[in-house]
């Protein structure tokens, strides 16, 4: 039986992170202010999460919401935030910088990738702002990043599945392609079947705590995603070389 795909869950609070782990999440993307797509979590949130969670944690490195081109001062801030993530034992970092022309800023991203070593690096959904995603894939590979989080250039992942499949084929094991952007229990099976990716990302619509202040609904949503991935792993043929990544963090 094929091993099930990895599930990464994005969260903005310690309580949500703990609920995600209880639900079976394999990896946590730690952010704050997910309403703007996520920004760098505070040092205190990193410390608290690391103290309570054994699963891999990737910290968002994003000084603000909005466009993905940054001033020199913001770039320096990102460097400091990467150092903070390393000193607080994060397993990876998540960032993405574009030029004013809307291309991958290879030099700036490569500098941050080098600074982040030995942490894994995810190039986030700034990738979906690119005009040519296949050219962008080659540019991100040139930066030394580990994986790309993408919805295939569409607002919703289910509308970008054909493009994600092309990216997986072109990457051919050189880069982990991480589908995300609106993944829910209702559409995950289709995303899995049409992409056969080895990892998937969801925030479950950033479900809020219930009236008792708990994250039971969030935990149950994560568990539903895990169960779907387990079911799909029993139904799918072994992954092709284009989908094998050999990396699980």
Model-derived regions, located:
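Hydrophobic faces of well-ordered beta-strands that scaffold small-molecule active sites
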Residues: 5-9, 28-30, 57-61, 93-95, ...
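N-terminal pre-domain/capping segments
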Residues: 2-28, 33-40
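Catalytic cores of alpha/beta
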Residues: 15-19, 69-81, 128-143, 167-169, ...
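Short, low-complexity, charge-dense intrinsically disordered segments
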Residues: 237-249
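Ordered, amphipathic secondary-structure segments that act as subunit-interaction surfaces
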Residues: 80-97, 104
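Active-site-adjacent beta->alpha loops and helix N-cap segments on the catalytic face
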Residues: 15, 34-55, 73-76, 97-117, ...
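Active-site mouth loops of central-metabolism enzymes
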Residues: 2-12, 61-79, 98, 122-133
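A structural motif
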Residues: 25, 54, 89-91, 118, ...
């Amino acid at each position: 039986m094929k091993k099930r795909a990895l599930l990464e869950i994005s969260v903005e609070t310690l309580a949500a992170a703990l609920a995600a782990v209880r639900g079976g999440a394999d990896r946590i993307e730690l952010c704050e202010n997910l309403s703007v797509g996520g920004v760098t979590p505070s040092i205190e949130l990193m410390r608290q999460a690391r103290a309570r969670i054994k699963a891999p944690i990737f910290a968002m490195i994003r000084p603000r919401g909005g466009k993905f081109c940054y001033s020199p001062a913001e770039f320096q801030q990102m460097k400091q935030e990467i150092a903070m993530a390393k000193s607080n034992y994060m397993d990876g970092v998540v960032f993405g910088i574009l030029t004013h022309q809307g291309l991958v800023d290879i030099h700036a991203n490569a500098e941050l990738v080098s600074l982040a070593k030995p942490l894994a690096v995810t190039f986030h959904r700034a990738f979906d702002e690119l005009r040519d995603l296949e050219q962008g894939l080659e540019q991100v590979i040139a930066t030394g990043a580990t994986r790309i989080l993408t919805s295939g250039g569409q607002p919703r992942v289910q509308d970008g599945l054909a493009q994600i499949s092309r990216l997986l084929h072109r990457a051919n094991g050189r880069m982990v392609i991480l589908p995300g952007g609106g993944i829910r229990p209702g559409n995950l099976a289709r995303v899995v079947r049409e992409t056969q990716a080895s990892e998937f990302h969801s925030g479950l619509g950033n479900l809020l705590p219930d009236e008792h202040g708990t994250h039971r609904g969030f935990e149950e949503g994560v568990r539903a995603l895990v169960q779907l991935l387990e079911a799909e792993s029993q139904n799918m043929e072994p992954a092709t070389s284009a989908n094998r990544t050999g990396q699980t963090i």
